[in-house]
A protein has these predicted regions:
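Helix N-cap motif at beta-to-alpha junctions
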Residues: 14-15, 78-82
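Exposed loop/turn and edge beta-strand positions of beta-sandwich/beta-sheet ligand-binding modules
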Residues: 38, 70, 100
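Eukaryotic phosphotyrosine signaling hubs
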Residues: 5-7, 69-73
Protein backbone atom coordinates (compact mmCIF):
# COMPACT_ATOMS: atom_id res chain seq x y z
CA UNK A 1 0.00 0.00 0.00
CA UNK A 2 1.35 3.43 -0.97
CA UNK A 3 0.26 6.94 -0.05
CA UNK A 4 0.84 10.22 -1.83
CA UNK A 5 0.16 13.81 -0.84
CA UNK A 6 -3.01 15.34 -2.27
CA UNK A 7 -3.68 18.68 -0.53
CA UNK A 8 -3.39 20.82 2.57
CA UNK A 9 -6.24 22.97 3.89
CA UNK A 10 -6.31 26.58 5.10
CA UNK A 11 -9.54 28.15 6.39
CA UNK A 12 -10.00 31.72 5.12
CA UNK A 13 -12.26 34.64 6.01
CA UNK A 14 -12.30 36.34 2.61
CA UNK A 15 -12.10 33.87 -0.26
CA UNK A 16 -11.50 36.42 -3.02
CA UNK A 17 -8.74 38.15 -1.04
CA UNK A 18 -7.01 34.83 -0.33
CA UNK A 19 -7.26 33.64 -3.93
CA UNK A 20 -5.82 36.96 -5.10
CA UNK A 21 -2.97 36.68 -2.56
CA UNK A 22 -1.96 33.16 -3.64
CA UNK A 23 -2.12 34.06 -7.32
CA UNK A 24 -0.03 37.22 -6.91
CA UNK A 25 2.47 35.74 -4.45
CA UNK A 26 2.97 32.31 -6.03
CA UNK A 27 1.05 32.07 -9.30
CA UNK A 28 -1.42 29.52 -7.89
CA UNK A 29 -4.70 29.30 -9.80
CA UNK A 30 -8.06 27.73 -9.16
CA UNK A 31 -8.17 24.12 -10.29
CA UNK A 32 -11.62 23.19 -9.00
CA UNK A 33 -14.34 24.36 -6.66
CA UNK A 34 -17.09 22.79 -4.55
CA UNK A 35 -19.94 24.94 -3.25
CA UNK A 36 -22.61 24.19 -0.68
CA UNK A 37 -25.09 26.37 1.16
CA UNK A 38 -22.75 26.87 4.11
CA UNK A 39 -19.24 26.73 2.71
CA UNK A 40 -17.07 26.88 -0.39
CA UNK A 41 -13.94 24.84 -1.09
CA UNK A 42 -11.49 26.15 -3.69
CA UNK A 43 -8.50 24.05 -4.70
CA UNK A 44 -5.49 26.00 -5.94
CA UNK A 45 -2.59 24.45 -7.81
CA UNK A 46 0.74 25.38 -9.26
CA UNK A 47 0.06 23.93 -12.72
CA UNK A 48 3.05 21.58 -12.46
CA UNK A 49 2.22 19.06 -9.73
CA UNK A 50 -0.88 17.26 -8.46
CA UNK A 51 -0.62 18.85 -4.99
CA UNK A 52 -3.36 21.35 -4.14
CA UNK A 53 -3.92 24.07 -1.57
CA UNK A 54 -7.52 23.83 -0.39
CA UNK A 55 -9.07 27.09 0.78
CA UNK A 56 -12.14 26.56 2.95
CA UNK A 57 -14.51 29.50 3.20
CA UNK A 58 -17.28 29.20 5.80
CA UNK A 59 -19.91 31.67 4.62
CA UNK A 60 -21.14 32.74 8.07
CA UNK A 61 -17.72 32.96 9.76
CA UNK A 62 -16.71 36.53 10.61
CA UNK A 63 -14.14 36.23 13.42
CA UNK A 64 -10.49 35.41 12.68
CA UNK A 65 -9.34 31.84 13.23
CA UNK A 66 -7.22 31.10 16.29
CA UNK A 67 -4.12 29.58 14.72
CA UNK A 68 -2.55 28.93 18.11
CA UNK A 69 1.16 28.51 18.59
CA UNK A 70 1.63 25.73 16.06
CA UNK A 71 4.48 26.24 13.67
CA UNK A 72 2.80 24.78 10.60
CA UNK A 73 3.69 26.03 7.16
CA UNK A 74 3.47 25.27 3.47
CA UNK A 75 6.98 24.88 2.02
CA UNK A 76 7.60 25.83 -1.60
CA UNK A 77 10.57 25.51 -3.95
CA UNK A 78 11.53 28.12 -6.53
CA UNK A 79 14.15 28.07 -9.24
CA UNK A 80 14.89 31.78 -8.58
CA UNK A 81 15.18 32.44 -4.85
CA UNK A 82 16.45 36.01 -5.27
CA UNK A 83 13.56 37.04 -7.53
CA UNK A 84 11.00 35.34 -5.28
CA UNK A 85 12.45 37.01 -2.19
CA UNK A 86 12.45 40.42 -3.89
CA UNK A 87 8.82 39.99 -4.98
CA UNK A 88 7.65 38.92 -1.52
CA UNK A 89 9.65 41.71 0.15
CA UNK A 90 8.00 44.22 -2.19
CA UNK A 91 4.59 42.77 -1.29
CA UNK A 92 5.46 43.22 2.41
CA UNK A 93 4.55 39.63 3.29
CA UNK A 94 7.86 38.28 4.65
CA UNK A 95 7.34 37.61 8.37
CA UNK A 96 10.48 35.58 9.19
CA UNK A 97 13.83 35.17 7.54
CA UNK A 98 16.91 33.02 8.19
CA UNK A 99 19.54 33.99 5.61
CA UNK A 100 21.98 31.40 6.97
CA UNK A 101 19.53 28.61 6.13
CA UNK A 102 18.40 30.27 2.90
CA UNK A 103 14.75 30.39 3.95
CA UNK A 104 12.05 32.93 4.66
CA UNK A 105 8.40 32.71 5.63
CA UNK A 106 5.52 34.77 4.30
CA UNK A 107 2.19 35.44 5.97
CA UNK A 108 -1.10 35.26 4.09
CA UNK A 109 -4.15 37.47 4.82
CA UNK A 110 -5.41 35.00 7.45
CA UNK A 111 -2.12 34.68 9.32
CA UNK A 112 -0.90 31.38 7.86
Amino acid sequence: MAFTFTHVNFNVLDLARSMDFYEKAFGFREKRRMETEGFTLVYLWDGATDFELELTYLHERKEPYNLGEKEFHLALYTDDYAAAHAKHAEMGIICYENAEMGIYFVEDPDGY
